Amino acid sequence: MAGSSSRNASSFGAEEDEDGALISTRGLEAFGRKVTTTAGHLIGPIDPTSSTHYQNAMSDLHKQLRRPNLQRSVFSFAKTTPTDLVRSKLSTSEIQYRALTFLPDELLRNIPENENSYSLFQGFQASLPEAGEEKGKKHRRRISRGRKLIDNASEGGSEGDGPPSVAKLKKEKEALNHRLEMMGIRKNMASSEIHGIDNKIANLNSMRRIVLDRLAGLEQEESMLEHENVENRLEEAQEQIEDAEALGKSIVGAEEGDDVENSGMESSFMSESIYEKLPSSASTSSSKGSRRHKTIRRKSMPILHEHFEPGSSIREIQAHDDMVTALDFDVPFGTMVSSALDDTVRVWDMNAGRCMGLLEGHTASVRTLQVEDNIVATGSMDATIRLWDLSKARYDPQDKIKEEQEEGEEDQLAFGEALEREQQTHIPQGTMQDCPLFTLEAHVDEVTALHFRGDTLISGSADKTLRQWDLEKGRCVQTLDVMWAAAQASATMGSTEGTWRQTGRLPDATADFVGAVQVFDAALACGTADGMVRLWDLRSGQVHRSLVGHTGPVTCLQFDDVHLVTGSLDRSIRIWDLRTGAIYDAYAYDAPITSMMFDTRRIVAAAGEDMVKVYDKTDGRHWDCGIGAQREASEEMVERNIIEKCRVKDGYMVEGRRSGMVGIWSC
């Protein structure tokens, strides 16, 4: 038998050598022959020398195999594939679990190192304890109440419980340690969340800066497109065509007249009628001047300043060489007009930070001015009021932009700040010579306050009068004597409410008799040096109401539909209710108020410091805006940086300082 086994093995090895590279059924056939040989050896004739154990075992197995159920299972098992065999051993859920939880080695190599000292399971435990802890606290309170009742009931018979057991103390210690561990894990989790939030905020801030730069570029491009002068060029071309047609007709008519009169005037080469019909040099120059470039009003409003942080500096302009006495602007990033003690009135392009030109005509410093669309009104110490139309300016921002684009990038990088300072100090000549409209002359002393709306202009002067002007006719239509009105009010009311009030302080030489005025239709508000605010009716020329409260000269005021806000040298700002005449609110600063203005949200005031005082009307918050707000607490205030005038519109604030510098801020 051993020989047959070795022979079979040798034959099987030979067959493997022949077809080793192929997978066939020969292996199974060889395995079957081995099983048959072994079975024949076990079931064959009984060898007296061998044991009967194998024979008995095979007999029992033969009886079991003859059962039908077992035969069917064996036959079905023979038909199954290895895949079916695996599926029969594992359930569907187990197969899915193994497929989902299997991780290849590539992913395992890329797992980052964990810096946390706690595991994922511990973090999961720490994120769930709130409800359980509340339930445990309630349960412990109930148990403690029950124990107290039992102790109280057993106080008479027993001497009390003994010392707590060691096991109980160990259990409480483990619970406390577990709670401390969970608290430490929660602290680490909260710290990780804070770091994650900080990273997200930093990413969002960087994205915001990128979008903000994009918005600034879009507004710059929008401004350039609006100054392309296509409409002006079209108008000029049409006017030139009309002039050429008119000139051609005049020449033809002159030639016909020359033919008729040629017999009597042979010595002349052209008739006099030609000189009458040809445009003169003066008219030609004036027509050319009227066709000069007109400043295009912006069709869209800038919104860049709305996205700056409150208190952010937008631009600084060295507007003058002396203290700023008045300033105003039309719209954010629009046109600003400023005046100073250097006796100049300058017009500025705030979008580019460049001077557009000078408004020349006053013989003294301008104390007050107002900008409304294209119209500018200026009141001077020479007792005159002049009106200007900025739409007739010859300023072209594209010329300066083209010059800058022609310069090299390296020069711009090296001398960028010097170029910006040069642009601010450079004053174009002759750009505003067509802007003057007319001059209003009636006051006999310096004009200290003015305000116009529509065709009505009100001016206040040191001659103690208010004058109403009709801007269509250019003449004074009414004169209001403040002292006479105060005396009339005193005589009518029989009290001292309307009389000229002494503030109880030494007279201030710098205080203007008429500090501020504002007109709306027939209503006029006027603040004077006696601290009174008088409300006039222009139809009757009488004082309708007097508001008493300030103890110093009123320097500024402004009203809307409901409230009137006034600022005074007594360091206070008062908000009045126009319906009742009572004080609605009031607050004070550490120095006199020299300028004030409000918009829909905030009240800004210049109070003798190097920063503008801002009062948020919506939430009642006071805060500072300006270079003083960015100054260290240990640094001293520079007197040259003290702010004298401030204006605000739609969160876009402009302030003028004693040094002549003008700062533009977002508030």
Swiss-Prot record:
Gene3D superfamilies: 6.10.280.220, YVTN repeat-like/Quinoprotein amine dehydrogenase. Keywords: Coiled coil, Membrane, Mitochondrion, Mitochondrion outer membrane, Repeat, WD repeat. WD repeats lie at residues 319-360, 361-398, 442-481, 501-546, 549-586, 588-625, 628-666. It comes from the Eukaryota. It is a peripheral membrane protein. Residues 137-147 have a biased composition (Basic residues). The keyword Mitochondrion applies. Residues 1-11 have a biased composition (Polar residues). Residues 1-20, 131-167, 276-295 are annotated as: Disordered. It is found in: Mitochondrion outer membrane. Pfam families: WD40 (PF00400). GO terms for biological process: mitochondrial fission; peroxisome fission. GO terms for cellular component: mitochondrial outer membrane; mitochondrion. Residues 166-253 form a coiled coil. InterPro entries: G-protein_beta_WD-40_rep, WD40/YVTN_repeat-like_dom_sf, WD40_repeat_CS, WD40_repeat_dom_sf, WD40_rpt. The keyword Nucleotide-binding does not apply. Involved in mitochondrial fission. Acts as an adapter protein required to form mitochondrial fission complexes. Formation of these complexes is required to promote constriction and fission of the mitochondrial compartment at a late step in mitochondrial division. Belongs to the WD repeat MDV1/CAF4 family. PANTHER family: CCR4-ASSOCIATED FACTOR 4, WD40 REPEAT PROTEIN 12, 37. This is Mitochondrial division protein 1. It comes from Sclerotinia sclerotiorum (strain ATCC 18683 / 1980 / Ss-1). The lineage of its organism: Eukaryota, Fungi, Dikarya, Ascomycota, Pezizomycotina.
